[in-house]
Curated annotation (Swiss-Prot):
This is Ribosome-recycling factor. Pfam families: RRF (PF01765). One of its GO terms (molecular function) is ribosomal large subunit binding. Coiled coil: none annotated.
Amino acid sequence: MINEIKKSAEQKMQKTLEAFKNDLAKVRTGRAHTGILDHVMVDYYGSDVPVNQVANVTLIDARTIGVQPWEKPMLAKIEKAIRDSDLGLNPASMGEIIRVPMPMLTEERRKDLIKVVRGEAEGARVAVRNIRRDSNTEFKNLLKDKAITEDDERRGQDEIQKLTDKYTAEIDKMLATKEADLLAV
């Protein structure tokens, strides 16, 4: 019973960590990386799909992403989708490939992005702590129903706390890495 609660809590915490990682990927740094376009949606025969499902997305150099559509008619649609996204990018069509140069981030914009990233990290930490609270409540209910002993409850809460500490530390580590990326000129 304790292991089931622990396993459930760990799965939920892992999902929270994955969601935080995806949120971090949406925040662009000064450097180009192909993942930045993963959330840009393109109209493909009536349905919205991510850019990486209708084109090859590659790095041309450290500050430029190349997007090569698999179908020529998609070129203009992809270019428009990138331009209309909230990423602040200005793609340029070069024959069969779209070049997406990454603009330099201003100091003010970097600080704003760091605030956003810290907010996302705090949201992830709160989610992990809520999972801990829910698990501890389950242990208390089991104790009240006399399904487990007080020692089992204490042991379960300690294990959940260790998981909470582990995932919170992982969130902090990811935050520090992203902040360093944002501050790098």
